[in-house]
């Protein structure tokens, strides 16, 4: 057996984990600024939750979920996305009785069996936002503004928000009827999957990635042309709020998103380079989802950001920050007494917020210095019997190799003055 990670998964090594910590920190910061609180939930759920929540006709449910029977014979699925799980959490823990709206965010791994290309993985990571309890277009604008400003905070300056409205269940009936009639005229040219979608949910055809289906869909009826007065008013108000917030957006009448729970507002955020768009965020409103999976009627809206794709984009654009210096100090020891003292000194330095490691392998001083250099430490503190007797240590600046003799009790302040 070859020892390696399964196809479609990826290890995050120390030389890149700081990038993940950086974007996670930025996301937590923006969530805090907008008043959102973190939730955490299981990696797996009962399969029925995703069948009812995500939609039986979606590619996710039909083709991509990791589903198995547990030892009790229950059908379990590794979460393919976060919204359905947060909706279940909302119902199970009685969030409907809490002050509305409820603003929640999460950072998760998710799982889908799909082609591994262009920043896509079978285990991937998402940042997500869910807002429950408000139908107002103000909430839609806030959600979009949050995601937009998150990307701006990372230095992305070519991002555009593509927005659309797919209407409510009332006005969507006429749209779906006309859409079905349109695609029936091209039935023989549709891919096998879209032929099945035609009866169950013809809107899914608009989301098909097959070239022929994409070509046919270009002239299909647009959901925005069938909006009822209430949905039109909602969408116009959203555009006004986005204008007021200074968010760069355009209307894309063919965005429908790949999940069945969406209503009214749907959006994608893309990075534009040489007229090519890379989607880095997607979301929308889902006013019927909570009721659909067994809760009381509660409007909601949210989005998800693909972390792997985001990091890939930041790397391509040179927006990755410099790796922080960890550890800052290496304590080299000569002898058992020095090693014991090194523990004491290391504890003091760490208490002062200075990242410190000590020698553990009883190597020669030369080997220890080579190790400190490979770690990229700023300083090496050298302690031997002679230094212990005098209550001092040698502090070597690794970049210049210059050394100073410093009293041990003043070491922390000395190093802090140099950092």
UniProtKB/Swiss-Prot annotation:
GO molecular function: ATP binding; catalytic activity, acting on a protein; histidine-tRNA ligase activity; transferase activity
Organism: Caldicellulosiruptor saccharolyticus (strain ATCC 43494 / DSM 8903 / Tp8T 6331)
Primary location class: cytoplasm
GO-annotated biological processes: histidyl-tRNA aminoacylation
Protein's name according to its UniProt entry: Histidine--tRNA ligase
Family under the similarity heading: Belongs to the class-II aminoacyl-tRNA synthetase family.
Subcellular location: Cytoplasm
EC number: 6.1.1.21
Subunit: Homodimer.
Domain of life (superkingdom): Bacteria
Record field: catalytic activity: tRNA(His) + L-histidine + ATP = L-histidyl-tRNA(His) + AMP + diphosphate + H(+)
